[in-house]
Amino acid sequence: GVEEAMYLWLNGQFIGYAEDSFTPSEFDLTPYVKEKENVLAVQVHKMSTAAFLEDQDFFRFFGIFRNVTLKAIPDVHLEDVWFKPVLNQDNESGSVSVSMKVSATDSQNVTAGFILKDREENILVEKSLQLNKENNHLEGTICVDLESVRLWDNHNPYLYHAYVELKAEDGSLAEVIPYDIGFRRIEIIDKVVYLNGKRLVITGVNRHEWNARTGRCIGIEDMKADISCMLRNNINSVRTCHYPDQIPWYYMCDDAGIYVMAETNLESHGSFQKLGAIEPSCNVPGSIPQWRDAVLERAKNNFETFKNHTSILFWSLGNESYAGDDIEAMNVYFAEKKDGRLVHYESAYYNRAYEDTISDFETRMYAKPEDVEEYLNNSPKKPYILCEFMHDMGNSMGGLGSYMKLIDKYDMYHGGFIWDFIDQAIMVKDPVTGKDVLRYGGDFDDKPADYEFSANGIVFADRKEKPAMQEVRYYYGLYR
């Protein structure tokens, strides 16, 4: 939540440095905290090495734009948990593994318990184990089988209530961590994507975080309004373009049954697109060894922050960053996690040398319907989605039906994500009329500017639905 890089001090002591503007940065302040009058200082930098990796199309607002939180943890604390619910092939039974990492300041004998309840709070599973010492932490995994489970999907996003209980050496309850989990299975069979045994159809949208009055500092009410709008208009999927969103958003998608393409904070289109031409001689990260750890760290941040969210069906490696060994390494990272999700990345399309090692999909942006058909009619290798289509700038959206027809014609075509959900424009007082008006790039003496190019939403910046939404509601509704 700091754009674009930061140094941190506490009481004059240097604590650390962080990049990656859209995932949490955590620091241990314990050695430097005083009982009173602590001074936490953040030095924010507009330009840093992160600038090469954060070239998204949006307004530049440098500074702190998400919550800053101070946490105190108990002596026995759950540092990390990974819930892995599995839906078996019979679509009736399942299993859950719960992997835990615990810090224990004084106690060496810690017991971890796992409790699973249904929506009505009936206890379905209760199991515990003694954690083992591993690399200055206590670790352990609990595995359970379930004869019957309710499925999670867009039509019925059924979530179970999971709890991890930690007990100290003396038997006292040290910590309880609740989490809601769901059972669903996404897989590719004969080049077709299935969710819970049924062909997956994506009626999706790309969504930037935006508020016309506060920019990227959005609140819970903004998120609730967006979820409500999507459900009302038959939108079943969202791509977090082109960075991880605020953490509450993923919980809301879990609850609402919105399928999520969770995108890593990476875009470097300026390094390989020059005046519209594809010219990758200066591409970052490409195959440059010095950039590999930086992009892998961003992939890790994305995965570790959101790995427990049922709504995430796809990990996306980033946006418009061409292809090379470093992007391939990101694909390997996600694939090795074996978490049952699929991996997405569009820009491998520009470099076919990597088409077999990057992305589980053939994925394009703004391909014409006939271009989609050309691929699907000529020995296609992968299922096809449009990660961006129907660029809704001005009075657009008239051609949506031409794309939707392809869903019925080709099993390997799974739909796509409209560009995009909300206009990025800023509400200001008109100096002449005194009325609230929306302003775009170039309206703030910012030169050069891309003018209204950030206004491509199916809702205006104040979240009022555009006329184009009628087209979305109708055509997307055909595939509910």
Which role fits each region the language model picked out?
Residues 1-80, 106, 244-247, 259, ...:
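Accessory beta-strand-rich segments of carbohydrate-active enzymes
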Residues 4-11, 16-19, 50, 75-84, ...:
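Active-site-adjacent substrate/metal-binding segments within catalytic domains
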Residues 23-27, 136-142:
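Short strand-edge motifs at loop-to-beta-strand transitions and within beta-strands
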Residues 33-37, 146-159:
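Short glycine/proline/serine/threonine-rich loop/turn segments at secondary-structure transition edges
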Residues 41-107, 180-185, 299-302, 451-480:
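Non-catalytic, glycine-rich low-complexity segments
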Residues 60-63, 296, 313-315, 332, ...:
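Substrate-binding clefts and catalytic carboxylate motifs of secreted carbohydrate-active enzymes
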Residues 93-131, 140, 162:
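Beta-strand-rich binding/interaction modules
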Residues 269, 317-319, 337-352, 415-420:
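Aromatic-lined carbohydrate-recognition surfaces of secreted/lumenal glycan-active proteins
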